[in-house]
């Protein structure tokens, strides 16, 4: 009986490892295609396939199916605006499976929608530790930095995403806008400094009071 149990356990471990290796191989091939896509439409087809893999728990068993169902349920709650319920559900998934990058990424999205930007960034950091190629998490990181008015960091996040996904539409659109915001901030700051300097002159002092 013990011998049979050992064979079953070894079989399950082998099956799990094969699935994990198969998943990794599929992602590697898709990321290669994503990086070498010649146009946006073909890149978006590859992107969709990557998301389909990310959103399914890596374990091809009953537990994995259940966690995938919970993630889908949480995403549905998030889309309905039930942010607190979604947050609690994603937190439960993370407690059960802390190594699943997409659980952290979806909770980061909820935290962003709840205006908890630093907490969202913390979850994104873990997401990227688990899946360094997660262009979605990098885009989310950029959005959080934008809300925090850290525009240079937002640009860096978008550029990091572009190294993985060169034709990423949001990065192409947002980087020029962010550069304009930085320039506007610099001009505004320069004017403020000039005005303050002018106020130090005795002739201008009364006008500044």
Give the location of each predicted region.
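Alpha-helical adaptor scaffolds
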Residues: 64-131, 136
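Terminal, low-structured helical/coil segments at or just beyond the last alpha-helical repeat
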Residues: 56, 160-209
């Amino acid at each position: 009986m013990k011998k049979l149990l050992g064979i079953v356990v070894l079989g399950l471990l082998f099956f799990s490892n094969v699935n994990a290796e198969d998943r990794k191989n599929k992602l590697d091939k898709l990321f290669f295609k994503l990086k070498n896509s010649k146009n946006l439409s073909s890149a978006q087809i590859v992107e969709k396939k990557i998301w389909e893999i990310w959103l399914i728990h890596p374990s091809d068993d009953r537990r994995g199916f259940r966690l995938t169902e919970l993630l889908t349920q949480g995403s549905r709650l998030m889309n309905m605006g039930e942010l607190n319920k979604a947050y609690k559900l994603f937190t439960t998934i993370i407690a059960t499976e802390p190594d699943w990058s997409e659980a952290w990424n979806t909770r980061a999205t909820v935290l962003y929608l709840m205006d908890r930007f630093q907490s969202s960034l913390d979850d994104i950091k873990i997401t990227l530790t688990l899946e360094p190629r997660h262009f979605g998490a990098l885009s989310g990181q950029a959005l959080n930095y934008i809300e925090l008015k850290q525009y240079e960091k937002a640009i860096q996040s978008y550029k990091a995403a572009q190294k993985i996904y060169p034709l990423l539409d949001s990065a192409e659109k947002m980087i020029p806008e962010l550069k304009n915001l930085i320039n506007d901030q610099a001009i505004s700051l320069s004017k403020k400094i000039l005005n303050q300097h002018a106020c130090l002159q005795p002739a201008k002092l009364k006008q500044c009071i």
